[in-house]
A protein has these predicted regions:
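Short loop/turn segments that flank or connect secondary-structure elements
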Residues: 1-238
Length: 238
């Protein structure tokens, strides 16, 4: 699908904060099987680790796997599906074992969200004024016995409408992904592997769950950008 068609599809499924949708979770567990696409951001890893009283590295090593996004050129972490039904590793007896700390994509289902940036700002590399948009996903489980607004649904899960952690994460993906894309053109595969490992460690795993998440993310992102700027300087001579 072309970027233009993707944009049209997003617009078609976008739903306003006070628009309504019908959905009722029946705890059937269907949304937790045949899943290879439960992607985690650093805050998801942090929250799950805190819930399980372990480290983000423990969660990553025991329940996740990673790959490099074909369009983002960025390390992507997903929950590693188990068994022939490809179930979420946290699905236990048809219930979520980390319900109180479930990944954001699971918590807001059947909604999804994306970050919209003005086209002129994007062309100029200005990511400072994004707007968080919400969309309705195809609903393949539960029933339609309850009606909600987007605002009500998110409030029920204590998710802010303007989720700063979500915004900052996607800003960094866009900014760092652009640098990594250029690096791929000039650096050898082994060097790129080390660079991607550095991104994975600093942005996804380098957190103390006894401390607040966002200040640590900002520090990690700053440290990573300093390292990438050094790489950019090196690439000028390649």
């Amino acid at each position: 699908m072309s970027m233009e068609n993707i944009a049209k599809d997003l617009e078609a499924r976008t739903i306003g904060l006070d628009d309504t949708f019908r959905f009722h979770c029946t705890a059937c567990g269907k949304c937790c099987i045949n899943r290879e696409d439960i992607l985690l951001n650093p805050r998801d890893l942090y929250r799950i680790a805190k819930h399980l009283n372990c480290t983000p590295l423990d969660v990553y090593q025991n329940y996740c796997e990673s790959y490099i996004g074909s369009s983002s050129h960025f390390p992507i972490v997903r929950l590693k599906p188990k068994g022939h039904v490809k179930r979420c590793p946290f699905l236990k007896d048809r219930k979520c074992a980390v319900h109180e700390a479930k990944p954001g994509v699971c918590a807001i289902y059947p909604l999804g969200r994306y970050m919209k940036i003005d086209s002129d700002d994007y062309k100029q590399g200005n990511l400072d004024n994004p707007v968080v948009k919400y969309l309705i996903q195809p609903i393949e489980c539960g029933d339609n016995s309850c009606e909600h607004t987007v605002r009500e649904w998110l409030s029920g899960f204590n998710i802010a409408l303007e989720d700063q952690a979500f915004i900052r994460w996607h800003q960094e993906i866009a900014k760092i992904g652009s640098i990594l894309k250029q690096a791929e053109k000039k650096l050898s595969a082994p060097v790129m592997g080390k660079l991607w490992d550095t991104v994975l460690i600093l942005l996804y795993l380098n957190y103390d769950v006894t401390k607040d998440y966002l200040p640590q993310f900002e520090e990690n992102a700053s440290d990573l950008m300093t390292a990438l700027q050094t790489v950019q300087t090196m690439m000028k001579g390649v």
